[in-house]
C-alpha cells in the first residue's frame, strides 16, 4: 500500500511504462492526468477559500490541510504528465470549478453558515471522487494506477471527514435551536 508520502512523490521516468498490452495510449493517459490536475487545482482553491472564510479554527486548519494535500497531488500528477512527454495543466478552470461543484462556496462563505460551507466542500469532494473513479476505470499503467488509487483513497477519507463534521454541525445547530 502506498502511504501519503508516496502518493505525493513523483516517480522517475525510467519507472514509467508508456504503453503496453491493454494499457491506454500515451496521449489518453496524459489527458486523463490533466483532467485530474484540474480537479485537484479546483479542490486546492476551494479549500483555500473555505479555510480563509470560516471562523471555526478546526475547520480552518482542516481546509488548509486539504488545500495543501490537493496541491501536492496536483504536483505529482504534473510530474507524471511531464515524464510522459506531455504539457501538464497548471491550474483549474472556472468551467471546471463550476462543473466540479465549488461554485456555491462563495455564497456559503458570505452567509457565515459553517454547515453550508461543509455542504459545498462535500459537494466538491463528490465531484473529485467521481473524477478519480472515472480515471480508474481506464486501462492505466500499473504505476500510475497505484498513485491514483492512493490519491482517491485520501479524497474519500477527506470526503468522509467533511461529511462527519457537517452531520455533527447539523446536530449542534439543531440542539441549540438554530
Task: Enumerate the predicted regions with their spans.
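Preference for long, well-ordered alpha-helical segments
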Residues: 120-178
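Alpha-helical bundle segments that constitute or directly flank the non-heme di-iron/ferroxidase center
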Residues: 21-55, 115-139
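Conserved alpha-helical segments that form or flank metal/cofactor-binding pockets of metalloenzymes
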Residues: 58-95, 158, 162-165
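Alpha-helical scaffold segments that form or flank carboxylate-/histidine-based iron centers
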Residues: 28-36, 57-75, 114-118, 143-155
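Generic structural concept
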Residues: 30, 34-37, 41, 67, ...
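Carboxylate-rich helix-loop segments that flank metal/cofactor sites and access channels
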Residues: 9-17, 76-129
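A structural signal for well-ordered alpha-helices, especially hydrophobic packing surfaces
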Residues: 44, 74, 78-81, 102, ...
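Low-complexity, polar/amphipathic intrinsically disordered segments that mediate membrane, lipid-surface
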Residues: 2-14, 20, 24-26, 149, ...
Amino acid at each position: 500500500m502506498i502511504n501519503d508520502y508516496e502518493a505525493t512523490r513523483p516517480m522517475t521516468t525510467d519507472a514509467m511504462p508508456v504503453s503496453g498490452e491493454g494499457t491506454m495510449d500515451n496521449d489518453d493517459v496524459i489527458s486523463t492526468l490533466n483532467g485530474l490536475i484540474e480537479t485537484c487545482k479546483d479542490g486546492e482553491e476551494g479549500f483555500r477559500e473555505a479555510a480563509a472564510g470560516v471562523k471555526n479554527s478546526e475547520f480552518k486548519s482542516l481546509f488548509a490541510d486539504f488545500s495543501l494535500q490537493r496541491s501536492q497531488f496536483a504536483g505529482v500528477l504534473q510530474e507524471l504528465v511531464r515524464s510522459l512527454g506531455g504539457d501538464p495543466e497548471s491550474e483549474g478552470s472556472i468551467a471546471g470549478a463550476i462543473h466540479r461543484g465549488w461554485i456555491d462556496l462563495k455564497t456559503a462563505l458570505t452567509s457565515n453558515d459553517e454547515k453550508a460551507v461543509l455542504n459545498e466542500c462535500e459537494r466538491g469532494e463528490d465531484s473529485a471522487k467521481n473524477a478519480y473513479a472515472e480515471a480508474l476505470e481506464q486501462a492505466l499503467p500499473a504505476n500510475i494506477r497505484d498513485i491514483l488509487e492512493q490519491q482517491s483513497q485520501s479524497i474519500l477519507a477527506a470526503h468522509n471527514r467533511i461529511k462527519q463534521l457537517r452531520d455533527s454541525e447539523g446536530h449542534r445547530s439543531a440542539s441549540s435551536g438554530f
